[in-house]
Each structure stands twice: as C-alpha cells, then as structure tokens.
C-alpha cells in the first residue's frame, strides 16, 4: 500500500474525528445559549453529528484510490 495513500486516509480520518467531537459539542452549546430548551440543543447536536458522518461517508466513497496509486508509480 502506498505511503501517499496511507497519509491521505489518516489525514481524512483525523479531520473527521476532530469534527465529530468538536462540531456537535459546539453546536449544542451555541443552541443552548440561544435557546433554553435542552431537548432542542441535543437534537440539533445529534443532527450535526449526522452531518459529519454523512460527510465522511461521501468523502470516503469519492476518494479516488486508483489515481493515487497511479500517481505513486
């Protein structure tokens, strides 16, 4: 397996891991600040986590591994 491919995968994984931790928590507290309803804050934070997850799935499926392997050679 290519070192370029491994770096790309690890970089993408680290980005989405950080986004999965930071984005929902940030969203929860921002919505909590704007509205006193904890249920709404939790629901929107869950929605934010799903947005990050869908983004990761889309990024993983659109990753062009054939071009990266060809670029290596």
UniProtKB/Swiss-Prot annotation:
Keywords tagged on the record: Cytoplasmic vesicle, Endoplasmic reticulum, Membrane, Transmembrane, Transmembrane helix
Record organism: Meyerozyma guilliermondii (strain ATCC 6260 / CBS 566 / DSM 6381 / JCM 1539 / NBRC 10279 / NRRL Y-324)
Gene field: VMA21
Residue positions of motif Prevents secretion from ER: 70-73
Protein name: Vacuolar ATPase assembly integral membrane protein VMA21
Lumenal side: 34-37
Entry-linked HAMAP family: VMA21 (MF_03058)
GO terms for biological process, alphabetical: vacuolar proton-transporting V-type ATPase complex assembly
TM ranges: 13-33, 38-58
